[in-house]
Regions:
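Carbohydrate-binding surfaces of carbohydrate-active enzymes
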Residues: 24, 28-30, 105, 116, ...
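Short, acidic/polar
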Residues: 49-66, 153-165, 258-267, 323-331, ...
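Glycine-rich, aromatic-flanked loop segments that form ligand/cofactor-binding clefts
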Residues: 26-35, 70-77, 98-142, 175-178, ...
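Aromatic- and glycine-enriched glycan-recognition loops and surfaces
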Residues: 47-68, 88-114, 157-158, 229-230, ...
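Catalytic domains of carbohydrate-active enzymes, especially glycoside hydrolases
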Residues: 55-81, 169, 274, 331, ...
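Aromatic-lined carbohydrate-binding/catalytic grooves of carbohydrate-active enzymes
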Residues: 66-101, 124-146, 150, 183-194, ...
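Active-site-adjacent "subsite" loops/lids of carbohydrate-active enzymes
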Residues: 53, 118-169, 178, 194, ...
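Boundary/entry segment of secreted carbohydrate-active catalytic domains
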Residues: 23-54
Length: 736
């Protein structure tokens, strides 16, 4: 069927749109809003469910959003089976009767001055695929993939007609969700259209499956291009109809997502006005809330970015409400990193709202408005964590966690040690980007191209400091092992081989130069006192993860890398690989320090990053990473001492010569044994505000120090600030 894409244009001409003023776009002036949609039919709706969405009322939701001090409303207009407005393409749920939820919301939003954004689900269009089975994605065996649509099919024209319908209401913009290609096998798409277009582009047939060779490299590019073309095509169509209508796509280019979703970190983040991503302890961990925000920022530098968080205790699709302090912790973590935040409310099955939830939203949003002058300032970074999409795809392959663990472990170490950090992405990296960070860390970046090596060389020559861990640079462009590391010259060492173990050990003996003592700080194993012998000894400690044997050329070696013992059980493959064995013999140096130009490269032969995110996380492994940063960058602008349960974000406002230190106290109570998958548990939601001490030492002389909370106790002595904080979120303002 050919869709008439201009069917609704005449209707649009007479519509007064919400976003027609010359004022700043809604997303540039907003910090908090709500997304509201019904829940209960995610896996298939039925006309027998006449109660579903019966009370889902756009007018009531707009009023509730405005009363809770939300600055915009994202209202559900389309899910897999239903439309919640009068659509010619999809039926409405029977419970709505003659009501039009989108019309209700837009009319009320216009009265309230509340921008209304249409939430429109893209992937998993169940009803549409029942009507158009020819649009289904197909697996390598020619079988349709249940629920999935092919983005190269006629579905794009269908979606263009759908957005025309919704634009006619006068909405401020679209949030287009689920623009993925699936979150696991079976993979697509091998439909006739895809096969034809692939052959036209590459003059050869598609690979028969996931082959991890040259053909699969082309297939990955083809998949990425298909998603990009779909998004750009839809955005262009929307802007042609109404240039003021905003467009954002829900994004899955960040960990734990990989190639299977059809998105790269940068390629698929910038196809709208801003990127939207998600957080949530249930799906991403507490620690990754801030990481996701920085990832979205790095993917779209200079643009606003939106993060969605959920109301529910467990996940999106429950109707529970988290304690206020739990909501506050996630909300202010995201705002501190510079994003704007959409809180997702999934209504009751009948579409009704929970007044207790909106009372909590109102309390949290009121606090945001009180503090809004303290968000979205220039970040202060010390370390850039380098993320390689090529390593994700071709080293991680079907187990991307093998790569993610190092990246996330490096992040964990920086957070726990209160070292300001940001994210650097391989797709948009430049010398200017690198030079925003005094130190750049390559956490097991297995695949490093010649172009990247040249860029790192420029960065180091000019005074940059590079930290390299584990197997960085030891793989070819398709993940194949190399006989040498691409980083040999930078590291000042020759790659001799990779250990076939992950239970590797490090011993830190007396450093060859006194200035290297920094590497040993707060690592008791490096300075164990043997009372009976009357001497200080260095004791090996486990550094779980990949390890490489190096032979120094121009680098100074520090410490020892030790391989683990192996027994007969190992040779017979009867030993549990998750259980580490003790240290055996030394096989090479643990650390290499090489000076190039005005800068330096510090290499860990082992993987303290991987270890920090592992089940065998020792304090020593993260201290190694932190000490490396402090050795390479001894004159940090701020040194922050705080409990590991406190996250810190530092920003700068040059016009007022003010540094802001956001303090975020995570205070989840202990959890009990789970009913399944012991010992892996979700943390308990935060109920109580924590109390903790913080000490900050600044490089610049301070003129004044102020805390936002009256309860915070402050004491300043020159450039040293001590604070006692008793809240989830605090901001210390340091004027210099």
């Amino acid at each position: 069927m050919k869709w008439n894409l201009h069917l609704l244009f005449p209707a649009l001409l007479g519509v007064t749109l919400v976003a027609t003023t010359a004022e700043e776009p809604w997303f540039r002036r907003s910090l908090v809003g709500l997304e509201v949609g019904p829940t209960g039919s995610q896996f298939g709706g039925s006309t027998n469910d006449t109660v579903f969405a019966k009370r889902f009322n756009g007018r009531d939701i707009a009023r509730a959003t405005e009363a809770s001090r939300g600055e915009y409303l994202v209202i559900w207009t389309r899910e897999g089976d239903w439309a919640f407005y009068d659509s010619k393409l999809l039926p409405k749920p029977p419970g709505l009767g003659q009501r039009d939820v989108l019309r209700e919301a837009v009319d009320e939003g216009r009265k309230l001055g509340l921008p209304i954004i249409a939430y429109c689900q893209v992937q998993y269009p169940s009803q549409t695929l029942r009507e158009h089975p020819e649009w289904r994605a197909v697996d390598q065996d020619g079988k349709p993939i249940a629920g999935r649509v092919c983005y190269r099919s006629g579905y794009l024209d269908y979606m263009k007609t759908m957005v025309e319908e919704q634009l006619a209401y006068g909405i401020a913009g679209f949030h287009l969700d689920m623009v993925d290609q699936g979150f696991g096998p079976p993979y697509g798409c091998w439909c006739a259209t895809c096969q034809k277009e692939f052959h036209a582009q590459y003059s050869q047939p598609m690979p028969k499956g996931v082959t991890w060779d040259d053909d699969w490299d082309r297939m990955l590019e083809f998949r990425y291009a298909g998603s990009e073309r779909f998004e750009k095509g839809l955005t262009k169509h929307i802007r042609r109809i109404n240039p003021r209508a905003t467009v954002d796509y829900n994004y899955h280019g960040n960990p734990p997502f990989s190639w299977e979703v059809g998105q790269r970190p940068v390629q698929h983040a910038g196809n709208g006005d801003f990127v939207t991503g998600e957080t949530g302890v249930w799906g991403f961990s507490a620690l990754t809330v801030g990481l996701n925000a920085e990832f979205y920022k790095a993917a779209t530098p200079g643009l606003p970015f939106q993060i969605a968080m959920q109301r529910g205790v467990r996940m999106y699709h429950d109707q529970t409400t988290r304690p206020l302090n739990d909501l506050r912790w996630e909300l202010f973590t995201l705002l501190s990193h510079g994003g704007f935040v959409t809180l997702v409310d999934k209504t009751a099955f009948d579409g009704g709202l929970d007044p207790q939830a909106y009372e909590r939203f109102g309390s949290a949003f009121k606090e945001v408005h009180t503090k809004r002058a303290h968000f979205q300032h220039t970040p202060v970074y010390e370390v850039g964590l380098y993320y390689s999409s090529r390593t994700r795809d071709w080293f991680g392959r079907d187990k991307p966690a093998d790569y993610f663990q190092s990246f996330q472990g490096a992040h964990k170490a920086m957070v726990y040690e209160h070292i300001p950090w940001g994210v650097v992405l391989d797709e948009n990296v430049s010398l200017d980007t690198l030079q925003k960070f005094p130190v750049v860390m390559l956490p097991n970046v297995a695949i490093v191209s010649e172009k990247e090596v040249a860029l790192f060389r420029q960065y180091v020559d000019a005074g940059g400091k590079l930290i390299v861990t584990g197997i960085s640079g030891t793989r070819g462009p398709r993940g194949e092992p190399h006989s040498q590391s691409a980083l040999n010259e930078l590291m000042g060492a020759k790659f001799m081989g990779e250990l076939d173990s992950t239970d590797n050990w490090v011993r830190l003996r007396t450093p060859p130069k006194a200035e290297m003592e920094t590497l040993f700080q707060n690592i008791p194993h490096a300075r164990h006192r043997n009372e009976s012998a009357g001497r200080i000894e260095s004791v090996p400690f486990l550094v779980r993860g990949p390890a490489v044997v190096y032979e120094p050329t121009t680098a100074t070696p520090v410490g020892e890398l030790l391989k683990p013992h192996r027994s007969t059980l190992h040779s017979e493959n009867r030993y549990n690989k998750d259980w580490p064995m003790s240290a055996d013999a030394t096989v090479g140096p643990a650390i290499l320090l090489n000076h190039i130009g005005k800068g330096s490269v510090l290499t860990f032969a082992a993987s303290p990053d991987w270890a920090t995110a592992s089940d065998h996380h020792l304090t020593e492994t993260r201290k190694l990473l932190a000490n490396a940063v402090r050795l390479l960058s001894p004159t940090q602008r701020l040194v922050i001492e705080a409990p590991t349960t406190v996250q810190t974000v530092v920003t700068h406002e040059p016009a007022t010569r003010t540094l802001r230190v956001h303090l975020l106290g995570y205070n989840a109570p202990p959890q009990t044994t789970p009913a399944k998958d012991r010992p892996y548990v979700l943390p308990v939601p935060i109920e109580d505000a924590p109390m903790y001490r913080v000490r900050i030492t600044t490089r610049e002389p301070l003129k004044s120090v102020k805390a936002l909370n009256r309860s915070t106790q402050l004491n300043r002595r020159g450039n040293l600030v001590d604070a006692v904080v008793n809240d989830i979120h605090e901001v210390l303002l340091l004027r210099y």
